[in-house]
Structures are given as structure tokens and as C-alpha cells.
Amino acid sequence: NGTASGFESEVTGGFNKLANKYNFIALYPESVNFYDGDTLVNTFNDIIRETTNEEISSICLSDSERYVYPKYPNCDRGRCGWAPCADDANFVKLLIDHFKDNYKIRNVYMIGNSSGGTFVNSYVCKYPESITSAISINGMSRLGFGCTPNQPVNFITYASLNDTSVPPIGGISADGLFYETQESLIKTWVDKFECKEKVSKTYKHFETFNENLFSECLGGIKIVSILNLDSDHMWPEAGYDKETGLSSYTNYGTCVTDIQDEFKIPKCYRTNDRWGSEFILKKLFEFDNVN
């Protein structure tokens, strides 16, 4: 439940500075929000295909076995639903169209983290023509809601092995929600676009990463899966402690800067090394050599 300014400042280590460095426009969309007591609830509607309350009610543990999230007012998404009813995908599509109409835009890259990453998985299926490449970070699709787009688009799924919030392997999160696995997500993409080549490698910065690159796919796209072998539910290397050499979870981004001072939550005061953000950007920019 982070904010746009929390994402820009704390999670990414100052993403605007990278926008200036690489000469791109950075947009930070947010969905609707509300307060549950003193807690700001702010997340994306990641289930954007047609569904029913009964279907959504089947993708979590019983209420006695899970964390029951507060629900948006006047929005019933079923027993296991906790996202808003707003059409966030259409909102983001309209934003992209606006900037394409008013600026000379060559490429559109979509990045989402956590529930934002889950939203990215869904968005690329609904509006693939609107973007060049997308990366979903620590955001698996809810069980039964995995999808592939009807036309080729470059795609990266990034996950963390020790993530219990949105687990890439086990499928059941610590709060009792059911998710697709990273393996099943990437397989549906690779099968759909008939990728013929696969290159696997393991590399290390501070944390260790396993990467699979699928190429010679329909439309000339590339599909990538990256699994961080050391990290929890974190932006790349955001949880790494250089003194101990260990990675752990830190709650970044549930804060605001002065540009969002209307929210009654703590001000942002921490920042990450921007290595992880530049790592993500370079992965997206590598696709430019394909199209």
C-alpha cells in the first residue's frame, strides 16, 4: 500500500534522477484510496477481466486462516477481494494516450512493484498495443487470473525467492492469498508466442540472480524471467545490508513526500541505492535492440 511519491523516493532511490539521466518522462499513477482508521489504503485493481464474486471468493484461505484486508467502500469484490472496483487499466491507458498525443513519445515502458506488478501482468493482456515493454516486479497474478496478450509485447517477470508476500514458487502467500507461480506465468507467455531459443545465466552483484531469456518469439519479442535467489519482497537489492552481507525485508514506500502532503501518513525519510532501479531500466532498454 505504498504511494506514488513513496515509490519514487524510497523504493527506487529517486527514480526522477534516472529519468533525467536517461531522458524519459516518468509517470507515477495511483488508484483511488481511503482510510481504514488511521491507515491509508491505496492499491491497484489488478483483476481486470470479467469475473464473479464467487470466483474471487475461492482464491484465498478461509477467513480464520488468513489476514482479512479492509475493503473499499461500496465495492464488493468477493470474500478474497481487497482491491478497488475502479477501472485502473483504462485510467492508465488514458494517461498513456494523453502523453502520446501531446509529446513525441518513441517507447512506453511499464514498471510495477508488488500489487503494481500484479496490475502490470493484467494490463499488458488488455492493452498490449499501448506499450513497448513491461516488467512486473514481485507481482504474480492471482490464481486463475494469469493471462497473455493477444499480440506480442516484450515482457519481464522479476521475483524474489524468499518472498512470502507474493510467493513466486509456493503459490500461497503469508496473508493467505493464492497466486500463480512465476514458472507457470512465464510458460504461458513462452508457449503463446512460440519462443524457440532460451539462454539461462546466473550472475551476482550483491545479491544473486537467475535469468532466463527467451527469444526468436512471434513478433520478434523477447520474454525474460529473473529470480533473485537472496531477496524477500523487495525492489532489487533494496533489502541488502552491505555490513552483514544479508538481505531482509524493509517496508519502503508507505510514506509521502511534500508533493503528496494531503495524505495523513509519515513523510519519506529513507532512500535506496539506485543500482536496482538502473538494473531494471537497462533490462527494459535492452529490448530496443529488438524492435
Kindly label every feature range from the protein language model.
Residues 1-109, 122, 126, 237-248:
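Serine-hydrolase catalytic machinery in alpha/beta-hydrolase-like enzymes
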Residues 5, 100-153, 164:
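Primarily recognizes the serine-hydrolase "nucleophile elbow" in alpha/beta-hydrolase
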Residues 13, 86-93, 117-121, 129, ...:
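A structural signal for well-ordered alpha-helical segments within the folded catalytic domains
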Residues 15-18, 98-106, 125-126, 143-149, ...:
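Surface-exposed acidic, glycine-flexible loop patches that form ligand/cofactor-binding
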Residues 30-34, 140, 231:
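Short beta-to-alpha linker loops that shape the active-site pocket of alpha/beta-hydrolase fold enzymes
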Residues 75, 153, 190-291:
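Alpha/beta-hydrolase-fold serine-hydrolase catalytic core, especially in secreted/extracellular enzymes
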Residues 78-83, 175-176, 266-267:
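Second-shell loop/turn segments in exported
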Residues 132-219, 227-230:
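The feature captures the conserved acid-bearing segment of alpha/beta-hydrolase catalytic domains
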